Curated annotation (Swiss-Prot):
Cofactor binding summary note: Binds 1 Fe(2+) ion per subunit.
Cofactors, names only: Fe(2+)
Matching Gene3D superfamilies: Alpha-ketoglutarate-dependent dioxygenase AlkB-like, P-loop containing nucleotide triphosphate hydrolases
The protein's name in its UniProt record: RNA replication protein
EC number(s) per entry: 2.7.7.48, 3.6.4.13
Amino acids binding Fe cation: H663, D665, H720
Residues involved in 2-oxoglutarate binding: R729
Annotated GO MF terms: ATP binding; ATP hydrolysis activity; dioxygenase activity; metal ion binding; mRNA methyltransferase activity; RNA binding; RNA helicase activity; RNA-directed RNA polymerase activity
Summary of the function given for this chain in its UniProt record: RNA replication. The central part of this protein possibly functions as an ATP-binding helicase.
BP GO annotations: DNA-templated transcription; mRNA modification; RNA processing; viral RNA genome replication
Reaction(s) this enzyme catalyzes, per UniProt: RNA(n) + a ribonucleoside 5'-triphosphate = RNA(n+1) + diphosphate; ATP + H2O = ADP + phosphate + H(+)
């Protein structure tokens, strides 16, 4: 926390406030007098306004400031530094008689005044005219230019003991200074101030303290800008001697010692003392705010050095290091928060790049003893240098640079060496000026001397020159003039004409061979061959240029072997015929070729592509989807003797005459040097090969069974073509050396695959994920290997596993995939199911409990497809009741050709249905688009040992996707083909059930009677529609999801949508997209476009889809073409369109149409997207529950890990993460005690309502008479506009209630005036001290009333910390990140932000009232909440344990608890409740004294109690310091409010331990009549807290009417809110809550008349709920239909149709 009880201010304040009144008064007088003296002495010198940050910096240099800094100045910082040096520092070094040089008369006058009381200082003045402006500055100045001969100054020297020169010496050269000192005869001490940036001597070209000054260097001139402003700037020469001279001689040969007295910024105070004394050899200058530019990381644009302020960069750097994943946006946002109108674009660009480098650099490493390898590696890189490290190990170089910058991220320090500078010899024939020292090197040769002369000629400006010190003066120096001239001649002789762009090779020709083909590392275990330079085309030229060796030239000119072309005849039969032996050869693949495997049809041929790993095969002009890898191809490669590297197979079936022109199989997916094997079956063909260089063509005739091999490298040197002579001839082409499929780019992924995040492959980085690798540890133990070894193996076999481990744990499907990749058999035992995978190793049994995997000695179980499916957490168990009528109706539609195209009267299929009485158990996997609802099922069917399964898909394209992802032993068919055969499958999977015709599931169950039926789909997407059978199947129309009964899970997250997707408030895990929604009119090349109608699709042609056609597909990007037809689309259709793209979604819409759709569109989702709003999580849940009432929505993917990853939830708020105690939760079993419950059957008669509630808005006053007019303007609390999309209406239920919004300034100021009180800290402390002791007496009354005993133990604090932590992070990740600013450590703990609570004041007594003040909300820093939150929870628990059963604290409890309490303890309608006035504001220092007593009773540590006291006394906000009061939103608000309420009630009423009472904050209720007590009237009168005693037959508690029959909410309130939500379009978000509240009144039945409730409003409300009952969860809807014999509403006999009644009736 920013304020500590141990701080100096608090410690002194404690002593101060505990003193006697006389001592406190004396201290005040003493300090006030001292302050007055200081302000008087410094008046006018330090009154200029500067930011607090600069004030803090300058205070550290000893500067004082006025308490009222109100004056303005063009350059206030420089002005106050000058004043400090002139008036505060310099006088300390003056003598009694001081001669002041170059200082205005006004300043000397002020010097006399400011120092009149300190010493008797006499000042003599001397000014000279040099610059033109001196005529305006000085009054009696002299025109003397020669510093060494200032006659008038020398005349005044006799009267002085010291000379002070003000800001002039910086213009003097050393010679001038020496001559000036030589002119002095009496004075032996000169004090002088200068302005000279020390950065100049360190070689910097810009200021390192830019807040105080900046400068420019131009032609050895320095232009100095005070405060960086041109106003007041001046030019001076660059004089190195100013800071570097320690001693010198004057013109008379006398020694002078120069010493620095003080430095602030560029202002220095020096003294020159006659004589030679000890002085410093160097001075350190560190009063800068800029990080050393030489230590700053250089970016790609690092041309100039960056000058970055440390106070901005250091907090931002620490913030980025705290983030789990630093990003540029967060970095710039943090910098913006710190800068506060001092923005610097260089800093913004730097932190943005810094964030990216931190994210990309493996900065953190293990600590501990280094191993030998790391020591040698570090030593090697240290010796080799940074350039070598950068070339050969860029990650190491980046990490070193970043670590170096972090370590050196401090303000700059400059060390200036000082030396003796001798005097100038009078009468010398040369002038010493700016000549670099050159020391003769005896070993220097002629060329080096020439080089020196060149440097001198090029770099020096023609000036008078000499040398400062001549070594060996008087001796002769031999100059090798002839050698120098000869060297010039040699250099000129070898110069040749410049050649541009001519390649030069700097290595031997033999070494050059390796640059033509080398390996590139793709991953930890994968490499690919590549070329750095192109191959040699002209051998003779290459030989002459030395590019190739003679041996290589001979090999190229006279090759011993050509690229291998092998022709293999598999038999000796006549060409064109097929013998018996041919049939035996390649038998399996021959059968495969005859099947309907060909997925695409091209000109003259059909194509089928197979691969072991790749999803797709692309080439110029087309691409083919992989069909997996058939077992027949394995047999083919074995017959041909090929290894597993041949992983691509292209099967083509030709027509007679079909051909392909000359081409080479050199697609990017194949590496150079691979072989191509072609098998010719079922016919003859001509195969021609052409050499690229010579054009020579070789022709081969292929017959049935021939195999043709093109050897390595042939695709780079030859081309080939083929012509088929036989209809049905098949060509099978096998390829190897494909690019590693793990390294393929994202745009080559299957459109059905979800994007995966890239993996940091460093194993060291994965060590911190040990908690997520429980199964890998089990693998390691089982294989008897170390965990790092297993990680390395897994990284090579299944990188996806490590990606998921890094993300917090891997899924169950990934565990199965890993088992298959390692050929490692496992048996998985779960709480609901069992599955096993085949393999060649000893089987490992794994037990999964609560997301944790551990090995155990298990035995193989008998589990099938159902048991394997039940292992998945996203799989639910439901029941489906077959409707034989719907099944028969659909079968007849198939038979008549109305539905589908394959089945009909001539192909009836197997659609015989039988009677099925009992509901059929079904397994479900329902989820959001991209949630992976089919992934677990596909994993089982691909890798697990299960019987043959039939998969039914509604469309062919979805069928092809299933075929590619599951084992070939299973059958995948479209929805019609499913009835054309038996298939022999006992288990059936139906995909995308929403796209199937109504009655389809009924027909499948009736016809196939499966053992296990699995249903997959998404209720949020489109449903089946066809014009051909729309009328025929109209009677069967249904919501198929609603027919599946049971508590079914729904996966509400997406692997498809990008991580930065803001359309939906769910977790999205796809690859980030630069932009998610873009409004554009242009369609990208080949981009899929989604339109509303089939007519538009047919008009536009290829690449256009209707919404329903895209369901189940995904695209890299897509365009949604909006027209007027989208206004009629449902939310489900819009959901499909918005979830098809993994990247960008383009929306084509005109501005006029967009505005129209926002107003009139039927889809709420479409409206929100067009308005740029997010579809909230609650809206998604409501949409799901409309179709699946009892669903359990899962917002996070189930992971196999040892612990819950709370850190991932807090990733967006790293500071909050550091404040919370992240405990591993220990599940404790709650002991359930069954209590006897007497059921009360209710028979409710729904009478007709007169709907009097509708008349309420018609009695309202006009808006202008209800609003308040304040100094801040008129309030805006009454809504007379009505509802969006409707005509303005001032008489709606909205207008009944006041609406407080954050943009209503007038209401906010009214609320501040009413709710807040302001007082400074000292006043709060005094008032708190005066009332000390009253809290102890009040709490004693409370303890006596409830007979509280002293406690010696408290509930477990760790448990309370866990509950507090879970409460803080139960919010969505996005919301936590949004409030991350409250976790900023720079937020002071005693500072809070005040907001107006946005709410609609729906209370019965507030209907139709005039505008009133709202409720203020206080926003505290998270440091305060986390400091006190857990211990306050512990205290509240302890209080509850001490209170009797009859006393209820209604907090975080269900309505049923309050209802149960009322039925137990309330005996009559009469009750007592208290109505407090300004409850929060009234909790002043007296209540604080009470709170301290309560905290001591509950054993709070004294230091924590003192900290709580200080925080309450020191509260402040932007409006000022606050008095002691309670704030809504404060830590412990509910607890302290409740305690205060209870203590007040104990003093106000005659009550005891057995009096039943309810408390909740400022609400209190007790059955019956409480007698008012007068015993403590005097004490209560002292309190600001006042209460009105309210006794009535209609008592209220927390908005509930209390009665012996239970609780009931005022029905008019619920009905008003219902109608507002209904017409606002938000009813789905609050429907459940309104129904629950209304159910308590509904269950009272005839007792409603006893409670005296508005029965007419209650009946209207219940009728509204019953109409919407089908949208409620089953448990809630059951509250309104408990009785089987419930009667229909009067006048509404037709409300429940037979179908609806049967659908919702409780079985």
């Amino acid at each position: 926390m920013s304020i500590s009880v141990s701080s100096q201010r608090v410690a002194v304040s404690n002593l101060y406030t505990n003193g006697s009144e006389e001592s406190v008064k004396a201290i005040k007088e003493l300090k006030s007098k001292r302050l007055l003296e200081t302000e008087t002495r410094l008046d006018g010198l330090f009154d200029y306004y500067i930011p607090d940050t600069l004030r803090e910096i300058l205070t550290g240099y000893g500067m004082e400031f006025s308490v009222h800094s109100f004056q303005g100045h063009a350059h206030p910082v420089s002005k106050m530094i000058e004043n400090h040096m002139l008036y505060r520092v310099a006088p300390n070094y003056f003598s009694s008689n001081t001669l002041v040089v170059s200082c205005k008369e006004s300043k000397i006058k002020r010097l006399r005044l400011k120092n009149a009381n300190n010493r008797n200082l006499n000042f003599t003045q001397y000014n000279r005219l040099v610059h033109a402006n001196h005529h305006h500055r000085y009054e009696n100045a002299f025109r003397e230019l020669d510093v060494g001969n200032l006659t008038n100054l020398i005349n005044k020297e006799d009267q002085s003991e010291c000379i002070f020169i003000h800001d002039e010496v910086q213009y003097w050269s050393l010679d001038e200074m020496q001559r000036f000192l030589g002119s002095l005869s009496k004075v032996d001490r000169v004090v002088y101030s200068i302005i000279y940036p020390s950065e100049v001597e360190a070689g910097y070209s810009q200021s390192l303290f830019p807040e105080a000054y900046t400068f420019d260097l131009k032609d050895r001139r320095l232009v100095w800008y005070p405060d960086g402003k041109a106003e007041g700037a001046y030019t001076q020469p660059v004089n190195p001697w100013l800071l570097r001279c320690s001693k010198t001689e004057d013109s008379k040969g006398r020694s002078w010692t120069i010493t620095k007295l003080q430095t602030i910024g560029a202002h220095h105070l020096f003294s020159a003392i006659k004589g030679s004394y000890l002085t410093e050899e160097s001075y350190k200058y560190d009063n800068f705010t800029i990080i050393n530019p030489n230590d700053v990381l250089k970016g790609k644009r690092g041309g100039k050095p960056l000058y970055l302020r440390a106070r901005m960069i250091k907090p931002t750097l620490l913030y980025l290091l705290a983030l789990k994943k630093s990003d540029s946006n967060s970095a710039v946002a943090k910098l913006r928060m710190l800068s506060s109108r001092e923005e610097n674009m260089d800093e913004a660009l730097f932190v943005a790049q810094l964030a990216k480098q931190i994210k990309d650099t493996a900065l953190y490493d293990k600590m501990g003893n280094p191993n030998l390898r790391s020591i040698l590696s570090e030593s090697f890189y240290d010796i080799a240098g940074s350039l070598f490290t950068r070339l050969f190990n860029r990650p190491e170089y980046d990490a070193r640079c970043l670590e170096k910058f972090i370590r050196s991220c401090e303000t700059t320090e400059i060390h200036v060496e000082r030396r003796y500078m001798e005097g100038i010899r009078r009468g010398a024939s040369f002038k010493v000026q700016n000549v670099m020292d050159w020391v003769e090197d005896d070993s220097a040769n002629a060329l080096s001397e020439v080089n020196f002369l060149d440097i001198s000629w090029n770099d020096r400006v023609s000036e008078p020159y000499g040398i400062e010190c001549i070594h060996g003066e008087g001796s002769r120096i031999r100059v090798p003039l002839s050698r120098i001239l000869r060297a010039h001649e040699l250099i000129a002789g070898v110069q040749t004409d410049v050649e541009i762009n001519f390649p030069r090779y700097v290595c031997s020709s033999r070494a050059l061979i390796h640059f033509r083909q080398y390996l590139i590392k793709l991953g930890r275990f994968s490499f690919m061959e590549s070329r750095a330079i192109k191959d040699i085309e002209d051998i003779q030229a290459g030989l002459e240029e030395g590019v190739i060796t003679e041996e290589e030239a001979e090999l190229r000119l006279l090759p011993t072997t050509k690229p291998k072309i092998t022709e293999i005849h598999m038999d000796d039969d006549t060409p064109g015929t097929s013998g018996e032996s041919d049939v035996e050869k390649f038998k399996s693949v021959r059968s495969l070729c005859r099947e309907e495997i060909y997925s695409e049809k091209l000109k003259g041929r059909e194509v089928a592509f197979y691969s072991r790993h790749s999803k797709e095969y692309k080439y110029n002009g087309g691409s083919h989807r992989s069909l997996g890898w058939d077992e027949a191809l394995n047999e083919l490669t074995q017959e041909l003797g090929l290894d597993d590297s041949y992983d691509h197979c292209l099967i083509q079936r030709y027509t007679a005459g079909g051909s392909i022109g000359f081409h080479a199989d050199d697609e990017p997916c194949y590496l150079p040097g691979g072989s191509v094997v072609t098998v010719n079956l079922h016919g003859d063909a001509t195969f021609e090969v052409k050499e690229n260089q010579s054009g020579k063509i070789e022709k081969k005739e292929l017959h049935d069974g021939d195999v043709y091999v093109m050897g390595p490298g042939m695709q780079q040197t030859h081309k080939h073509r083929v012509t088929s002579h036989t209809d049905g001839r098949c060509s099978i082409t096998l390829r190897n050396k494909t690019v590693d499929y793990e390294a393929r780019k994202g745009d080559e992924d299957s459109e059905y695959e979800e994007d995966k995040a890239e993996l940091d492959e460093g194993i060291d980085y994965l060590q911190k994920n040990q908690g997520n690798m429980c199964s890998l540890k089990a693998f390691a133990d089982h294989m008897q290997l170390s965990t790092p070894s297993v990680i390395a193996i897994v990284n090579g076999a299944s990188p996806q596993t490590l990606r998921e481990i890094e993300d917090g744990g891997y899924s169950l499907a990934t565990l199965v995939n890993l088992s298959k990749a390692l050929d490692f058999p496992i048996a998985i035992h779960g709480e609901r199911g069992y599955a096993e995978t085949p393999g060649s190793y000893r089987r490992l049994h794994l037990k999964i409990t609560s997301g944790h995997v551990e090995p155990f000695e298990g035995v193989t179980s008998k589990g099938g497809f159902r048991e394997a499916m039940l292992l998945g957490d996203g799989v639910g168990v439901g029941h489906f009741r077959v409707d034989k009528a719907k099944a028969d109706r659909l079968a007849q539609s198939f038979y008549n050709g109305n539905t589908g195209v394959l089945l009909g009267k001539y192909n009836k299929g197997k659609m015989h249905t039988g009677e099925i009485e009992e509901p059929k158990e079904v397994l479900t996997a329902f989820g959001f688009a991209g949630s992976g609802k089919s992934h677990w099922c596909q994993t089982i069917l691909k890798h697990c040992s299960v019987e043959k399964v039939l998969v039914i898909s509604p469309r062919k394209v979805l069928r092809d996707d299933w075929v590619a992802k599951i084992s070939k032993k299973h059958r995948v068919v479209t929805f019609e083909v499913a009835f054309m055969d038996d298939y022999g499958c006992k288990d059936i999977v139906i995909d995308e059930i929403g796209l199937l015709p109504p009655g389809y599931i009924d027909l499948v169950i009736a016809a196939h009677q499966p053992r296990t039926l699995v249903l997959l789909g998404d209720p949020l997407q489109s449903t089946y529609h066809s014009k051909r059978d729309n009328v025929v199947l109209e009677a069967s129309q249904e919501d198929v999801f609603n027919r599946v009964r049971g508590k079914l899970p729904y996966l509400c997250y997406s692997h498809r949508l990008p991580r930065n997707c803001k359309l939906f408030e769910i977790e999205c895990m796809g690859a980030e997209s630069e932009k998610r929604v873009v409004y554009r009119s242009n369609r990208l090349k080949d981009e899929p476009t989604i339109c509303a109608t089939r007519a538009m699709k047919e008009e536009k042609g290829s690449g256009w889809y209707t919404v329903s056609e895209t369901q189940g597909l995904s695209f890299k990007s897509c365009l949604i073409y909006l027209d007027e037809h989208w206004a009629k689309k449902e939310d489900e259709d819009v959901m499909v369109a918005l979830t098809r793209s993994r990247g960008e979604i383009g929306i084509h819409v005109t501005p006029a149409l967009k505005k129209k759709l926002i107003t009139n569109a039927k889809s709420t989702l479409l409206k929100k997207v067009l308005k740029g709003e997010t579809y909230r999580r609650s809206e998604i849940v409501a949409m799901v529950r409309k179709h699946i009432p009892e669903t359990t929505v899962l917002f996070e993917e189930s992971r196999l890990a040892e612990t819950v990853d709370y850190e991932a939830r807090l990733a967006g708020d790293p500071y909050l993460k550091s404040l919370l105690a992240l405990y591993d939760e220990i599940e404790m079993e709650d002991i359930e005690i069954e209590e006897p419950v007497t059921l009360e059957p209710t028979k409710t008669h729904l009478a007709l309502s007169t709907k009097m509630n509708e008349l309420a808005p018609f009695d309202l006053k006009a808006k202008e008479h209800r609003e308040q007019h304040t100094e801040a303007g008129r309030t805006e609390q009454i809504d007379e506009n009505g509802y969006q999309g409707e005509v303005g209406d001032p008489m709606t239920h909205k207008a009944l209630y006041l609406r407080h919004t954050s943009d209503d300034t007038a209401t906010f100021m009214m609320s501040v005036k009413k709710r807040l009180r302001f007082r400074n800290y000292e006043a709060n402390r005094r008032k708190y001290k005066t009332c000390h002791g009253i809290g102890h007496q009040m709490f004693s009354v409370f303890k006596d009333t409830y007979q509280l005993k002293e406690i010696d133990s408290l509930p477990e604090l760790e448990r309370c910390e866990m509950e507090f932590m879970k409460k803080r992070i139960e919010k969505s990740t996005g919301l936590i990140e949004k409030h991350a600013g409250r976790s900023d450590p720079d937020w002071p703990s005693n500072y809070l932000k005040i907001f107006l609570k946005q709410q609609t004041c729906t209370k019965m007594e507030k209907r139709g009232v005039d505008a009133k003040a709202g409720q203020t909300i206080a926003c505290f820093a998270h440091s305060v909440l986390c400091r006190f939150g857990p211990i306050l929870r512990q205290t509240e628990k302890a209080l509850r344990e001490l209170l009797p059963e009859k006393l209820m604290i209604y907090s975080q409890k269900k309505y049923m608890d309050l209802d149960k309490w009322a039925k137990t303890w309330v005996e009559s309608m009469m009750g007592t409740d208290s109505d407090y006035e300004a409850f929060d504001r009234s909790q002043d220092e007296k209540v604080l004294d009470l709170e301290v007593e309560v905290l001591r009773f509950f054993l709070w540590p004294e230091d924590l109690i003192r900290e709580y006291e200080e925080l309450k006394l020191m509260m402040g906000c932007a409006l000022g310091d606050l008095a002691v009061m309670r704030f809504s939103g404060e830590f412990g608000t509910f607890f302290f409010n409740t305690v205060c309420n209870m203590v007040f009630s104990c003093m106000r009423y005659h009550i005891d331990r057995n009096t039943p009472m309810c408390f909740a904050g400022d609400d209190m209720y007790s059955p019956g009549i409480l007698r008012v007590k007068k015993d403590y009237e005097a004490t209560l009168d002292q309190l600001t807290l006042k209460a009105k005693v309210h006794i009535s037959e209609e008592p209220l508690f927390c908005g509930w009417r209390m009665s012996p029959f239970g609780i009931i909410k005022e029905p008019n309130l619920i009905l008003d809110r219902w109608k507002i939500a209904l017409r606002s379009g938000n009813l789905s978000l609050c429907l459940v809550n309104y129904a629950i509240e209304a159910s308590f009144g509904y269950r009272l039945s005839e007792h409603l008349y006893d409670v005296n409730i508005d029965v007419d409003a209650q009946q209207e409300l219940v009728r509204e709920i019953v109409i919407k009952k089908h949208l409620l969860p089953k448990k809630i809807s059951d509250l309104f239909s408990e009785d089987e014999c419930e009667r229909h509403s009067d006048g509404d006999e037709d409300f429940l149709s037979n179908d609806v009644a049967r659908l919702y009736r409780i079985e």
